[in-house]
């Protein structure tokens, strides 16, 4: 028998939760361990479903294997018992109280509907998250930031960061060209309908998260290449400013909390939109729009978008300073 086998169960009662964890006894099945653990907390009847398995790897330690369950229990008013001995907690409080990043990832996946999954999470010897995969597919990891923008020493999975609103870095690139009306056009991208937030909305020319271990400028160059097929160099991107912003909404029935510090870049090399190679999973289409017209639509309506005026103002200030320097 491996050194450690365990269960991790999310027990739900009317959108409140309890996290139950237990080590399996010799000769005990995962289902028996889960039932024993839930039963020890509350004798009320419950239903359950096996959802996945976690392989937990830490440097210089034996691997751990944890069976993942989701269970449901009726609220006290829906059953004969007058008392409820389990401490029920809302989703946000659960995330704050979970000690390990692997538990946060498990909780995030167990909240979602889907087939049985295999999750593997690896930590380095400093106990910092190094990698996470689900069914063999890598999950995106972020470096979490302090309020001043410095690293917090925490690496977090993308879905968890967007569930609890952790501050993380992103790179935004605005592609511009000169025109004869307001002075500049902006290239807008229309987000893919498959995006986990703001699907089908017009957005920044190119934008993306800064992966764990990466920095703003390399991330910006990578996003330009991946989303639009533009192979740029560091000298082609001009830093217009930094922006901190928080956005919260519900998409596909799930809360989405995006708290980010963004490096805002301007790219002014010639771009033929007809020759761009769009990443279908990210970008549905692109279009040029006059800068002032874009500002009017963002401020007063007229297009479905997820663009913010304060970021357009950052770009505008940069372009005005550049114009002054060129005169």
Predicted regions and their residues:
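Acidic, metal-coordinating catalytic segment for phosphate/diphosphate chemistry
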Residues: 1-8, 137-181
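A generic fold-level signal
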Residues: 2-4, 12, 61-63, 81, ...
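Residue-level signal for short segments within beta-strands and strand-turn junctions
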Residues: 11-13, 73, 146, 175-177, ...
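Conserved Nudix-box catalytic region and its N-terminal flanking loop in Nudix hydrolases
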Residues: 13-41, 53-55, 125-135, 158-171, ...
